[in-house]
């Protein structure tokens, strides 16, 4: 009798510093993820400032046989630098460089855990996302080494929703030097940007130049040396950009899957939108 294909072992992981109402929606969406072809474990780095959030995370891993790592266990911090400076309000999220690279350190510990425990891949997710139940199965089905699930964000109130993926540099939604129509370079950039954004609204799997926040990463990528460490001669802001540059330099392509967009609770006023999913 022919044996069925063995299930892949995926670690679902996140460094968590989140308000309790948002965290509740995130965790509930993890519970309903389909797992037809995969087995999953949970790993969270508890970086919460709210006791209610830490308690909620602890209850979740108890019920779902997950693991929590405390920040103290993975970072050497003195009291003056503990937690770092990060705030958010209805206007947006505000990061200082020290906090960005602190989070990079937490993510690197997750990657190390994946390699040490021989998982096939890690699904690294930000804790303010609400996932469609098919998300993980869809990402695995692409068979890509690095693939993000699309989500959209209004970075400023009332602004246009924008994706968490891009094509070049820090957040360029066009490819410099590519001519798609007659006219100026600026005209071509505008047209390319619109074409790219429209593409992301159609179900598919597309190659991109940068991604983050909701990403399936295969273990062989990590074993090749891809991390969130800062690249000293690159000034781009954000650990995801340094991850992507390092991945591309080591020969790994980056993809985004747009079949099941996640919902981003970027501000508390967007919390009611979860009910409309």
Q: Where are the language model's segments positioned?
A:
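Hydrophobic targeting segments
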Residues: 8-14, 30, 40-45
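Active-site-proximal specificity loops/subdomain of glycosyltransferases
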Residues: 56-119
């Amino acid at each position: 009798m022919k044996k069925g294909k063995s299930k892949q072992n995926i670690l679902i992981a996140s460094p968590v510093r989140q308000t309790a109402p948002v965290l509740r929606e995130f965790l509930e969406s993890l519970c309903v993820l389909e797992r037809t072809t995969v087995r999953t474990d949970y790993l969270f780095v508890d970086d919460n400032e709210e006791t209610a959030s830490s308690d909620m995370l602890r209850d979740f891993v108890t019920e779902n046989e997950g693991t929590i790592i405390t920040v103290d266990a993975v970072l050497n911090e003195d009291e003056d630098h503990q937690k770092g400076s990060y705030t958010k309000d209805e206007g947006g999220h505000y990061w200082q460089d020290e906090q960005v690279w602190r989070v990079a350190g937490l993510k690197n510990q997750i990657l190390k855990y994946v390699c040490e425990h021989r998982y096939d891949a890690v699904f690294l997710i930000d804790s303010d996302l609400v996932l469609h139940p098919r998300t993980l199965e869809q990402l695995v089905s692409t068979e890509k080494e690095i693939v993000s699930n699309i989500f959209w964000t209004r970075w400023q109130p009332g602004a246009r929703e924008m994706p968490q993926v891009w094509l070049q540099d820090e957040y360029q939604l066009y490819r410099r030097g590519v001519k798609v129509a007659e006219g100026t370079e600026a005209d071509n950039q505008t047209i390319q940007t619109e074409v790219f954004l429209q593409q992301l609204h159609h179900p598919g799997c597309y190659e991109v130049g940068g991604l983050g926040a909701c990403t399936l990463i295969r273990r062989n990528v990590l074993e090749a040396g891809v991390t969130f460490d800062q690249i000293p001669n690159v000034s781009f802001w954000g650990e995801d950009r340094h991850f992507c540059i390092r991945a591309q330099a080591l020969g790994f392509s980056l993809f985004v899957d747009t079949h099941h967009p996640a919902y981003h609770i970027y501000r508390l006023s967007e919390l009611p939108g979860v009910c409309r999913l």
